[in-house]
């Protein structure tokens, strides 16, 4: 059984300076994970494009400096020492749809930069968001589909599978996700148990569990018996099993309050309990 925790699960600790990518690796090892699902927010020194204007993001930006390569080598070495390979690198800020062609071009270059980073870490999967809005217009659809068609071959050259996630924008609607997946052979889905439009979650689960190549089993709140009180995680896992899911049981723990590490620990225990497996 493969088990992972997205590093976004520790974003509050990251924001206060109490966490970094090396602590994430250590925490995953302590929690008994078998792979690392890194969120690019945990690589702040590589994430400087927010301060750049779109016109300043030229193709050269996709290339990594000697210092950046050395930093990634350190991260990979730490992961190797912990016996943890990288799984899916979740990328924010390189989504495909923007109103402005200039912004689309800038995001394409950012995506190429993250392809290079994922390849350096040895990650087999990368999440690039669709963007857009839930009311996906034909123009949005065309831009998103064209963007994924353009991205997939470049990712494949680096041994990477591209995943979209039901995350935000157009991808919160099951009909949009299905339409995009059908239009882009080879595009995978990172299935998040949350994020769907509230009135479309059942349809989202039915779709997502059949297309999932990776998961974010999203947990928020636990009772004293260790049960998630807001989302039926056991049901989602059974649906995935019934659909023949073979990937890592990926967790995204987002506790509404309290200790992020303890919430992650409870999430891991819940997954083991559902599967009938013993924690490492």
What are these regions (language model features)?
Residues 1-34, 149, 156-157, 170-280:
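Histidine-acidic metal/acid-base catalytic patches
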Residues 7, 36-41, 88-93:
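Short, conserved active-site loops that position catalytic residues or coordinate cofactors/metal ions
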Residues 12-14, 44-47, 95-100, 132-138, ...:
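A short acidic, helix-capping loop that chelates divalent metal ions and anchors anionic groups
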Residues 37-75, 130-136:
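Glycine-rich, proline-tolerant flexible connector loops at the mouths of alpha/beta enzymes
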Residues 39, 92, 129, 218, ...:
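Conserved residues at the C-terminal ends of beta-strands
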Residues 40-42, 165-167, 254:
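A short gly/proline-enriched turn/hairpin at secondary-structure junctions
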Residues 65-188, 198, 261-262, 278-279:
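Active-site acidic/histidine proton-transfer and metal-coordination neighborhood
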């Amino acid at each position: 059984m493969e088990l992972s925790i997205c590093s976004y699960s520790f974003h509050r600790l990251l924001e206060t300076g109490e966490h970094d990518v090396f602590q994430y690796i250590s925490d995953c090892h302590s929690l008994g994970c078998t792979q690392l699902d890194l969120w690019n927010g945990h690589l702040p020194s590589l994430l400087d494009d927010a301060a750049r204007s779109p016109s300043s993001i030229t193709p050269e930006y996709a290339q990594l400096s000697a210092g950046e390569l050395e930093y990634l080598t350190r991260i990979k070495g730490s992961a190797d020492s912990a016996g943890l390979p990288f799984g899916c690198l979740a990328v924010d800020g390189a989504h495909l749809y923007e109103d402005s062609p200039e912004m689309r071009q800038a995001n394409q270059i950012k995506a190429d930069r993250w392809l290079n980073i994922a390849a350096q870490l040895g990650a087999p999967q990368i999440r690039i968001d669709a963007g857009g809005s839930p009311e996906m217009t034909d123009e949005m659809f065309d831009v998103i589909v064209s963007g994924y068609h353009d991205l997939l071959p470049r990712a494949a050259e680096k041994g990477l599978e591209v995943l979209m996630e039901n995350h935000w924008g157009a991808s919160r609607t099951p009909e949009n996700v299905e339409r995009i997946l059908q239009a882009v052979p080879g595009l995978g889905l990172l299935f998040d148990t949350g994020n769907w439009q509230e009135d479309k979650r059942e349809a989202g689960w039915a779709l997502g569990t059949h297309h999932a190549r990776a998961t974010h089993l999203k947990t928020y709140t636990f009772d004293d018996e260790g049960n998630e009180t807001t989302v039926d995680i056991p049901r989602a896992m059974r649906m995935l099993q019934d659909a023949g899911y073979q990937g890592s049981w990926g967790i995204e723990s987002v506790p509404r309050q309290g200790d992020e590490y303890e919430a992650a620990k409870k999430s891991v225990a819940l997954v083991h309990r559902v599967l009938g497996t013993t924690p490492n």
